[in-house]
Amino acid sequence: DIEMHFIHEKGSGSNPTPLLLMHGWPGSIVEFLHIIEKLAHPEKFGGNIEDAFDVIAPSLPGFGFSGRPSKPIGPRKMAAILNKLMIENLEYENYLAQGGDWGATIANWIGYDHSKSCKAIHINCLTMRHPDGPQTKQEEEWQQRFNQDQIMQDGYRTQQATKPQTLSYGMM
């Protein structure tokens, strides 16, 4: 088991919906600090108390203050760990999940493997594809644009994944 660090802001009202927020890479729960209170207590910001969420924002395994896995794990295993956090540790019957960047990949696996407990996901990064690939000309054109976009914007990921110390010298 991995020790998990997370923010757990109980929402206002009688029945707030549990919402799991997952950060990206290289990121942290700091990405969510400005929205947690707004999601948990919408009535303080002109919203309706009935729209409140119990917000759970974990540091992903190996990130921030969460424990480090003893061996490398991928997004599917992280999805299982986070589902366990929500269902077994925090004792929610069901929840919603949101993820961006690496968190989106994990959210996809939560939605795929844990749909009994996770009722919906929201992602802001496309990571999973249909196993048979593009089906139409429009999808093929989108895939080509997406692949080109990845080439043009992927340098940071390659640099950080293969030579992370290099970037630290520029920060000194």
Residue ranges and their predicted role:
Residues 1-172:
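Catalytic cores of eukaryotic secretory-pathway lumenal/extracellular enzymes that build
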